[in-house]
């Protein structure tokens, strides 16, 4: 048991006819409290410890603390000031008193403290004002104790507590402890249990619905005249060819084109995901604000702009097929067509003229598709997936040339190595390096330290340094010998970026 000093300004409570009455002490009193309580001094939180390097006992903590506050018995012959009387009296017999939590007290000289979340002990040499924090069982005690705690008739082993995350341990134990004396918490626990039951019911319904959908799909019998091709859970129907009408042949060619376009897009997505898997660069928006989803690489300029936007929205599938087919057989015709489309879209300004251009393009596309449909199927089969993969590989190579400015730079690699050497593994070092590399010049980065980089990164995400990060030393990112090389690398990097633009 440790002691704290209580002045005449602190309110104490005692039971009287099933009600709490308030009193104050006339003279300073040394109040005994159990070790293990949390105390806030300034902005830091500490744990009161009875002896240094020895963890407190949780059983004594629970026996001396309740929802009303810290329990202690005041001896007789102590002068008190009763409520609403204004004069002082003396106790004729000992009185059981409750010191409420979140009250301001004085910690005397010699009080032993342990800083929360850090294995560091302190011994006070002067009186300090502190606030008893509203916490009964600190989470740091539960982690290291190998005892069984009896809460509402249920024993909780340390093995069970170690499986719960740190931020949940303290809340669960505090709720169970309050259920002894406060019946109001039962409604809160009921609502929590109801929400858990609802989530379980939803998961069961989803499983049942999946089984039902499987049964319905099995019972359906497809028509013999329609062929179904499956690609990644998407069905596309292909009608059989008929030589009677040219309209049927047009429909069949459109369906085959749509299936090939979907395959090409899927193959391109799968290949882009596999490339550059070793190094992941974060990207920023134009406003230089940090976001995890937006890429950090600069936007490419379209060196070869294609048709107008309206033309892409309306006939995107037809454009994909026609452009690929004409690039192989009729390159001159496709280039002339694109030039004509560009000149028409630039000259036209009014809405009426834009509609005319769209109608012309659609009519030209319909005529070209109808003429191509009369050709043999062997010419259409020449567009294989291998050619689409070659087109995708060419696009990926252009993207790698632009991002090589970040990866191949010596200073960028040094920055990554320094951050990985001094920062904790909980931070994503690649994200922090890219955020600093894009938003600040090399001259400013040379003057920064590891702690400066971390604080700037967290401020960009509307966060602040944690208590553990305050003890991080501000190591320099670059040595004095490396500063001469950084200017040259920065100029080379900027010239490469300008050339790519």
Curated annotation (Swiss-Prot):
Q: Where is the composition biased (Acidic residues)?
A: 379-403
Q: Where is the composition biased (Low complexity)?
A: 231-274
| Residue spans of biased composition, Polar residues class | 333-352
Which residues fall in a compositionally biased region of kind Basic residues?
A: 201-214
The residue ranges flagged as biased composition, category Basic and acidic residues, are 191-200, 215-226, 304-316
Region Disordered, residue ranges = 179-404, 480-501
Question: Which species is this record about?
Answer: Acanthamoeba polyphaga mimivirus
Lineage, top ranks: Viruses, Varidnaviria, Bamfordvirae, Nucleocytoviricota, Megaviricetes
Q: Provide the protein name.
A: Uncharacterized protein L157
């Amino acid at each position: 048991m440790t002691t704290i000093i209580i002045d005449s300004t602190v309110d104490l409570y005692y039971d009287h006819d099933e009600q709490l009455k308030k009193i104050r002490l006339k003279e300073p009193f040394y109040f005994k409290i159990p070790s293990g309580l949390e105390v806030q001094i300034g902005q830091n939180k500490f744990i009161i410890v009875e002896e240094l390097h020895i963890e407190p006992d949780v059983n004594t903590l629970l026996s001396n603390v309740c929802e009303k506050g810290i329990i202690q018995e005041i001896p007789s012959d102590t002068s008190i000031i009763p409520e609403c009387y204004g004069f002082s009296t003396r106790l004729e017999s000992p009185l059981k008193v409750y010191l409420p939590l979140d009250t301001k007290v004085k910690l005397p000289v010699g009080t032993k403290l342990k800083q929360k979340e850090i294995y560091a002990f302190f011994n006070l040499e002067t009186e300090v004002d502190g606030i008893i924090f509203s916490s009964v069982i600190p989470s740091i005690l539960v982690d290291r104790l190998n005892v069984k705690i009896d809460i509402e008739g249920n024993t909780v082993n340390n093995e069970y507590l170690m499986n719960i995350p740190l931020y949940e341990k303290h809340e669960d134990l505090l709720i169970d402890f309050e259920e002894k004396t406060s019946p109001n918490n039962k409604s809160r626990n009921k609502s929590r249990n109801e929400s858990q039951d609802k989530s379980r019911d939803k998961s069961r319904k989803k499983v049942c619905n999946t089984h039902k959908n499987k049964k319905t799909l099995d019972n359906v019998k497809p028509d013999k005249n329609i062929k179904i091709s499956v690609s990644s859970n998407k069905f596309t129907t292909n009608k059989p060819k008929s030589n009677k009408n040219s309209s049927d042949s047009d429909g069949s060619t459109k369906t085959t084109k749509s299936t090939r376009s979907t395959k090409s897009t899927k193959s391109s997505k799968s290949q882009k995901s596999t490339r550059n898997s070793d190094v992941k660069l974060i990207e920023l928006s134009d406003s230089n604000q940090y976001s995890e989803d937006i890429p950090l690489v600069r936007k490419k300029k379209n060196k070869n702009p294609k048709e107008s936007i309206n033309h892409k929205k309306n006939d995107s599938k037809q454009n994909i097929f026609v452009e690929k087919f004409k690039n192989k057989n009729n390159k001159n015709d496709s280039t002339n067509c694109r030039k004509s489309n560009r000149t028409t879209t630039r000259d036209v300004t009014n809405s009426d003229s834009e509609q005319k251009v769209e109608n012309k393009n659609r009519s030209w596309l319909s005529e070209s598709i109808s003429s191509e449909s009369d050709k043999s199927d062997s010419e259409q089969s020449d567009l294989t997936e291998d050619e689409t993969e070659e087109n995708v590989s060419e696009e990926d190579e252009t993207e790698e040339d632009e991002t090589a400015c970040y990866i191949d730079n010596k200073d960028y690699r040094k920055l990554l190595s320094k951050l990985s050497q001094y920062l904790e593994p909980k931070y994503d070092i690649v994200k922090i390096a890219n955020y600093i590399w894009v938003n600040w010049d090399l001259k400013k980065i040379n003057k920064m330290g590891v702690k400066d980089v971390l604080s700037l990164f967290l401020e960009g995400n509307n966060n602040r340094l944690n208590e553990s990060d305050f003890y991080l030393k501000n190591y320099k990112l670059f040595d004095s010998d490396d500063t001469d090389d950084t200017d040259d690398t920065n100029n080379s990097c900027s010239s490469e970026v300008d050339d790519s633009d």
